[in-house]
């Protein structure tokens, strides 16, 4: 059935139902002929609530919907909508007073989701602080700007931008989300662009390491502009194609949130999954070469495996391999769902922190450059103190009087 025809039928049913309701309540009185000639027509909103014909300037209340998205709501509460002076309905409907009726299982999940949200906020805050500090260190320490550290710097930049966009998404309330505002869709688009650039810079990290370690190709021949193009430019057409698809096929709910049967999000999720799979292959080859080199050394087997495991754990957040754990939801089991929620929230929100620690704060070049700057500052400060003392007027702890000088001269 055509969507426009279906909507008109629903609005017709809405008008009939409201007419019956008003007549039963004794409200079936025609409008005042001396009153205003413009009225807000009977309409059906996106939630499915019927709004009756109303006079301009009126604040109309209707019972909350009984069910929405499979959740039962308290119908004794009311939703509110204003009929504007020009005879049109306000675009925003106030559903803030509508409360869901949750059973014990839903209440438990609601509690876990609230705790997971706190973990997300904490992780993103800690990550942003660490990432900004790492960004400033790479900005100030010009002596360590080799290609490898430039790649780290760009990856850290994408983490910062992605986390900031995540905070902006949290500011969007339910009404704006349902209203599908233009600025809301723009924020979702920007967030998804930074998500894709973040993964593509993880791919760049994998390309660099695989080229240097597995292919034993001289990194001096690698071009910075090529990595910049891969990390920042390739995600642009991907996100543009996704935005066009959303605009024409799934233009609702600020383009955020995926429902069953929605395929447009795979336009950008597909390339992300592909680069993660490639990075997994890179990681396998890097660890394989590392194990081969460790076996050729004279160290004990236990130390060799320890070094290999350490290198693998350090590379996991850099290459984004941890995201592969969240490709598939564990299922309907309660314990699995709860573990999935917390594990997902912790790893995804704290990943920026781990990358900053492993590849900036624990970076030998960064620490050596910081020590060098610190010693230089100490030397410079130590030189300034004697000069300042030499320029000051010396004073004696004892005062010599003019009378004593005369006595000394007389002797």
UniProtKB/Swiss-Prot annotation:
Q: Which residues lie on this side of the membrane: Extracellular?
A: 1-108, 172-185, 250-265, 328-334
- Annotated GO CC locations: cell surface; plasma membrane
**Transmembrane regions:** 109-139, 147-171, 186-214, 222-249, 266-291, 303-327, 335-364
A single GO molecular function, which one? corticotrophin-releasing factor receptor activity
Specify where it is mainly localized: membrane
Family matches, as SUPFAM superfamilies: Family A G protein-coupled receptor-like, Hormone receptor domain
Q: In which tissues is it expressed?
A: Highly expressed in the heart. Also expressed in lungs, skeletal muscle, gastrointestinal tract, epididymis, and brain.
Q: Which Gene Ontology BP annotations are present?
A: cell surface receptor signaling pathway; G protein-coupled receptor signaling pathway; negative regulation of angiogenesis; positive regulation of adenylate cyclase-activating G protein-coupled receptor signaling pathway
Cited InterPro entries: GPCR_2, GPCR_2-like_7TM, GPCR_2_CRF2_rcpt, GPCR_2_CRF_rcpt, GPCR_2_extracell_dom_sf, GPCR_2_extracellular_dom, GPCR_2_secretin-like, GPCR_2_secretin-like_CS
Q: How does this protein sit in the membrane?
A: Multi-pass membrane protein
User: Pfam families per the record?
Assistant: 7tm_2, HRM
Protein purpose: G-protein coupled receptor for CRH (corticotropin-releasing factor), UCN (urocortin), UCN2 and UCN3. Has high affinity for UCN. Ligand binding causes a conformation change that triggers signaling via guanine nucleotide-binding proteins (G proteins) and down-stream effectors, such as adenylate cyclase. Promotes the activation of adenylate cyclase, leading to increased intracellular cAMP levels.
* Subunit note: Monomer. Interacts with CRF, UCN, UCN2 and UCN3.
Q: What is known of its domains?
A: The transmembrane domain is composed of seven transmembrane helices that are arranged in V-shape. Transmembrane helix 7 assumes a sharply kinked structure.
Can you name this protein? Answer: Corticotropin-releasing factor receptor 2
Q: Which gene encodes it?
A: Crhr2
